[in-house]
């Protein structure tokens, strides 16, 4: 027994490069990661049993409170590959500038398994009859099985008969996949010299497409989980295009009170297929008095478009907050 849920991780990483010439080198990276995790816990099952139910010995509505084990398992595989070319221009107006162009593919595939209680089958076995097959509207057709909700072994130890377990409990399996395709390129170098140093610049572009497909298990998608939230399939994609630039300008250096004073400015334009376009910027000033003392100030803007999960989230079920139904805390 352990208080910490077990997690097993395995990773493989490889990278390499090949020099084509003094000004060009191709490179590549590959990453594979697999994670397996599991959680073992306990939960309660506490349905209201109708007074006329054959398992109810009290002659009026009563609640059976049962503690049962419940487990979850997850397996996640992540794969990423990058291929690019980098180097330095050796002639023309970009002489001395560095370049980098690359493509990337990333995939994440997950399987998650949850122990669940059939909601429709609980409803079928807690009414006026031992088992009402008409109430099994989602997980059927199945042979109706009555449940002895007030059996001493069930109440005290959570042990149902094998037939009752097979009827009430199952494992719901969901799958989630994310993919990303990315293309990017950048140039960096010095524009010209100032008395305090060279003005450095970077320009770049990037385009990427992200997609998600989260498919919960059948019972989760159909709201057939007793005592648990559920959700439908979340599926969709988005394409993003970006262009950016950044300047580093040395203003002053090596004068009394100023070892180095530098201005930095950056600008980024972003266009989401789902959201539209917007731009952000940042300006900063870096004042180094001496080696051990520096003062920085910055101002910038930002924005965030909806993530895929937020953009394509399907309908969900949940629970009413306790504060809205419990008069003792209202």
Located regions from the model:
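Transmembrane beta-strand segments that form the barrel wall of outer-membrane beta-barrel proteins
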Residues: 261-273, 297-299
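Short beta-alpha junctions and helix-cap segments that line functional grooves
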Residues: 278-284, 296, 309-311
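Solvent-exposed loop/turn segments connecting transmembrane beta-strands
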Residues: 237, 270-279
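Active-site-adjacent structural elements in folded domains
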Residues: 187, 246-250, 264-269, 279
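Feature captures outer-membrane beta-barrel proteins of Gram-negative bacteria and organelles
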Residues: 123, 243-245, 249, 279-287
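Short, conserved secondary-structure transition motifs
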Residues: 270-272, 288, 302-308
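Surface-exposed, low-complexity loop segments enriched in small/polar and acidic residues
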Residues: 1-8, 13, 17-241, 254-256, ...
